[in-house]
From Swiss-Prot:
Origin: domain of life: Eukaryota
Protein name: Gap junction alpha-8 protein
Localisation per UniProt entry: Cell membrane; Cell junction, Gap junction
Gene transcribed to yield this protein: Gja8
Source organism of this protein record: Mus musculus (Mouse)
Intramembrane stretches (start-end): 2-12
Membrane-side (Cytoplasmic) residue stretches: 13-21, 93-161, 232-440
Entries under Pfam families matching the protein: Connexin, Connexin50
Length: 440
């Protein structure tokens, strides 16, 4: 009996990870197979070969006839049957133990994560989810009341081990029938070589051995029936769960849709006040009035200001001229207003001055532009009488003719950009202003 202790300790683990029918099968295996085989069967088949007697004196004939009658001992055949039938259960136990260890590791990781979350929250107690509470309760329960659920790969392994047990049971029953039949006769006739003729051999305890054979075969049929019942039980359970799933899924979908609609309605309320940072992450739709109130960044004005400063540079002088011919700048409008207040000057003199200014601009280099003689100086001279004005104008004309050829190239480029305009229009504007003064 001590030889079966190792197998018995392993099969006890199967009891914790099996269904009710599986536990009944293990009970049948332990009590009606291992226990009886270890106690009574060995004594019944102990004198098997010594009590096998044949009516011949031919050497070797008795041994040959025994080998033909019993190719393998019944006890050894039943031992092999128990080992082969228990092997799928051992494989399942190995997978179940691995699964249990993985679950324990996962629970330990969840416990560590909960501890870290509680520490990060400043020692506040984190609410325990129902799943985590069930995990703690199941871990705190005793080993005897421990429940084990068959799901996923573990369920597949369990079904496979039942199938293999059934196949081994059927195989050994069929093999037993072809080897011995279902009973042992007291007389066995042998005609195998080296026997000279047909030899009669007699078997000891044939009735007792027949009873043991029938008992062991009945136990094999019971275990086979339990395997079939367990397969049908798991099949019915799977069918029931398959019928329950379509009813449960639409209910879950309806609950999710109702929660989604509630969340949308709460977002629509937040139209008249500024949302918090947490609510801005959830809300995705904003009114059109709020979109237009977005403040522009101060950086947007910088590139345009830099671009406006670069327009007045030397390489873009030609472009500035074309724009100044079409539209007057602020500087030109201010000069025109000042020229209206100037005293009248003869129109014939102004074109000559304009021609000289254009010649001075052509002589100037590309990076610098010449400027016409500022007309603001004319405004500063107060007009007292017409005669005094004429004398002053003639003196200014003489000075302009001398300075236009000498000082035009040395003028600063900043003034050229402001006063670079066609003189023909200035002369017309000045002549109109002077004519208005004369009429008054």
């Amino acid at each position: 009996m001590g030889d079966w202790s190792f197998l018995g300790n392993i099969l006890e683990e199967v009891n914790e990870h099996s269904t009710v029918i599986g536990r009944v099968w293990l009970t049948v295996l332990f009590i009606f197979r291992i226990l009886i085989l270890g106690t009574a069967a060995e004594f019944v088949w102990g004198d098997e070969q010594s009590d096998f007697v044949c009516n011949t004196q031919q050497p070797g004939c008795e041994n040959v006839c025994y080998d033909e009658a019993f190719p393998i001992s019944h006890i050894r055949l039943w031992v092999l049957q128990i080992i082969f039938v228990s092997t799928p259960s051992l494989m399942y136990v190995g997978h179940a133990v691995h699964h249990v260890r993985m679950e324990e590791k996962r629970k330990d990781r969840e416990a560590e994560e909960l501890c870290q979350q509680s520490r990060s929250n400043g020692g506040e107690r984190v609410p325990i989810a129902p799943d985590q509470a069930s995990i703690r309760k199941s871990s705190s329960s005793s080993k005897g009341t421990k429940k084990f659920r068959l799901e996923g790969t573990l369920l597949r392994t369990y079904v496979c081990h039942i199938i293999f047990k059934t196949l081994f049971e059927v195989g050994f029953i069929v093999g037993h029938y072809f080897l011995y039949g279902f009973r042992i006769l007291p007389l066995y006739r042998c005609s195998r070589w080296p026997c000279p003729n047909v030899v009669d051999c007699f078997v000891s305890r044939p009735t007792e051995k027949t009873i043991f054979i029938l008992f062991m075969l009945s136990v094999a049929f019971v275990s086979l029936f339990l395997n079939i019942m367990e397969m049908s039980h798991l099949g019915m359970k799977g069918i029931r769960s398959a019928f329950k799933r379509p009813v449960e899924q639409p209910l879950g979908e309806i609950a999710e849709k109702s929660l989604h609609s509630i969340a949308v309605s709460s977002i629509q309320k937040a139209k008249g006040y500024q949302l918090l940072e947490e609510e801005k992450i959830v809300s995705h739709y904003f009114p059109l009035t709020e979109v237009g109130m977005v403040e522009t960044s101060p950086l947007s004005a910088k590139p345009f200001s830099q671009f406006e400063e670069k327009i007045g540079t030397g390489p873009l002088a030609d472009m500035s001229r074309s724009y100044q011919e079409t539209l007057p700048s602020y500087a030109q409008v201010g000069v025109q207003e000042v020229e209206r207040e100037e005293p009248p000057i003869e129109e014939a003199v102004e074109p000559e001055v304009g021609e000289k200014k254009q010649e001075a601009e052509k002589v100037a280099p590309e990076g610098q532009e010449t400027v016409a003689v500022p007309d603001r100086e004319r405004v500063e001279t107060p007009g007292v009488g017409k005669e005094d004005e004429k004398e002053e104008l003639q003196a200014e004309k003489v000075t302009k003719q001398g300075l236009s050829a000498e000082k035009a190239p040395s003028l600063c480029p900043e003034l050229t950009t402001d006063d670079n305009r066609p003189l023909s229009r200035l002369s017309k504007a000045s002549s109109r202003a002077r004519s208005d003064d004369l009429t008054i």
